UniProtKB/Swiss-Prot annotation:
Domain of life: Eukaryota
Active site (UniProt): 182 (proton acceptor), 386 (proton acceptor)
Pfam families: Transferase
Name of the molecule in the record: Acyl transferase 10
Additional comment: The gain-of-function mutant OsAT10-D (T-DNA tagging) shows significant reduction of ferulate in leaf cell wall and strong increase p-coumarate in young leaf tissue but no discernible phenotypic alterations in vegetative development, lignin content, or lignin composition.
Enzyme class, broadest EC rank: transferase
Upper classification of the organism: Eukaryota, Viridiplantae, Streptophyta, Embryophyta, Tracheophyta
Organism, scientific name: Oryza sativa subsp. japonica (Rice)
Length: 443
């Protein structure tokens, strides 16, 4: 194996390409939630298009590939220019988090126009050389995302709103390393921003989706967030599973046959139901003990938010049952339990929005070995971001937390068709049994 290295060619702020408002914007209740103040890191892999495809030149220097315009300009330059233009529309991203002078103790966004920290980098290898960034990673996190020193970027990481790195590989592919602050955008909002960059990179006059700030229209219930949770010391093992489209289709048909032809379920429902079943059996929990799943669902439709709202609009969905019941249930039966929890979410969200929870904080979490936290990246919109080079072959979080029992659901990387589950939810003593149970019928 060779020595793989990434060189940071240039780095510094990219500012809006035109004048933007100078103001301080308040954040919504969910934006201000203590656990959201920090950068979410992800990587987005773009392969070089097939050179064997039939190409025809365009007047602007690009080419047509299979009826689509292909950008043959350097990716870093294209993304940098489009980012500057996108920041005119999404100008809060060019600011920083500060304390709200009108509401002391609350964070707000100072729209200062300082910009987004941007890095152009080059790797001395192909994407194949580093196994297309499959785990375990053959390049470090610091190689793939911006990690500026205080001298390079004086804004503290938890107060920075976005950082972007474009790393080109010798094969012609490139990787976008993204860091966005969860305090200003959930996954859907961050993907909306990056799709806007892609729209402008492809030559559209403006983003297809008009951004809406409107945090003042978001519910602000008189509910105090609970204390920050204690993190257990759980040395968890990392395991990846790919669920083929055929397997998912088979179980969807089984669920419809059991629940009724009008009832449908998603790939997400299936993979987390199977995870819940297999993990519960593998850890051999006390049959009477409660085993739990928690994931966040979009509340945009429930709360009637406008299209283009890019702040946090999520609400927790919590599923709990006795370990003995979960272990004895089929995957299809557990899909039904998950679907029922999702059905209840709208009512629970509205009760929270109206302050009718008796002071209880539904976002309060307890981290223990009996609980698994699920993050769904499969439908956020990152897989649709196109800078003129086509959609990414894979897009997902850079690292998973090895202290919290958690899993990531995402699209399987191309050319696979199906769903990938990245699990960090069992200790070493349970890992082999868990993996065997998960894979026993994935054919």
């Amino acid at each position: 194996m060779g020595v793989f290295a990434v060189t940071k060619v240039s780095e510094g702020p990219v500012r809006p390409s035109a004048a933007t408002p100078s103001e301080t914007l308040p954040l919504a209740w969910v934006d201000r939630y203590p656990t959201h103040r920090g950068l979410v890191e992800s990587v987005h892999i773009y392969l070089r298009r097939d050179d064997a495809a039939v190409e025809a030149p365009c007047a602007d220097g690009g080419v047509i590939v299979e009826g689509k315009k292909k950008n043959n300009k350097p990716a870093a330059a294209v993304v940098r220019g489009a980012l500057a233009d996108a920041l005119v529309h999404y100008y809060p991203f060019a600011g920083r988090i500060v304390e709200d002078e009108r509401s002391p103790g609350r964070p707000a966004v100072l729209c200062s126009g300082e910009g987004v920290y941007f890095v152009e980098a080059a790797a001395n290898c192909t994407l194949a050389d580093v196994n297309h960034l499959e785990r375990p990673l053959l390049l470090s996190k610091e190689d793939l995302v911006p990690c500026p020193t205080p001298e390079q970027w004086p804004v503290e990481p938890h107060n920075s709103l976005a950082m972007i790195q474009v790393t080109t590989f010798t094969c012609g592919g490139f990787v976008i390393g993204l860091r966005t602050n969860h305090a200003v955008a959930d996954g859907t909002g961050a993907a909306q921003f990056m799709n806007a960059v892609g729209d402008l990179a492809r030559g559209l006059p403006e983003p297809r989706v008009k951004p809406i700030w409107a945090r003042d229209r978001f519910p602000d219930p008189d509910i105090k967030p609970g204390p920050l949770p204690e993190l257990p010391v759980l040395p968890l093992q990392y395991i990846a599973f790919d669920f083929p489209a055929a397997y998912l289709g088979k179980l969807k048909a089984q669920y419809a046959a059991t629940a009724g032809a009008s009832k449908i379920c998603s790939a997400f429902d299936i993979v987390i139901a199977k995870l819940w079943q297999c993990r519960t059996r593998a850890i051999a929990a006390d049959p009477a003990a409660a085993v739990k799943l928690c994931f966040f669902a979009s509340a945009r439709q429930v709360l009637g938010l406008e299209t283009g709202y890019w702040g946090n609009a999520i609400f927790p969905v919590k599923v709990s049952a006795a370990a003995g019941e979960v272990a004895a249930s089929s995957v299809i039966e557990l899909v039904g339990v998950v679907r029922e929890a999702k059905r209840r979410m709208a009512g629970e969200c509205l009760r929270w929005a109206e302050g009718r929870t008796g002071g209880a904080d539904p976002f309060q979490m307890t981290f223990d070995y009996e609980s698994v936290y699920v993050s769904d990246w499969s439908k956020l919109g990152f897989n649709d971001v196109d800078y003129g080079y086509g959609a990414p072959s894979a897009a997902g979080p850079l690292v998973n937390c090895d202290l919290i029992s958690s899993v990531i659901v995402m699209r399987a990387p191309a050319p696979l068709a199906g769903t990938r589950l990245l699990a960090s939810c069992v200790t070493k003593e349970h890992a082999d049994d868990f993996a065997a149970r998960m894979r026993e019928d994935l054919v």
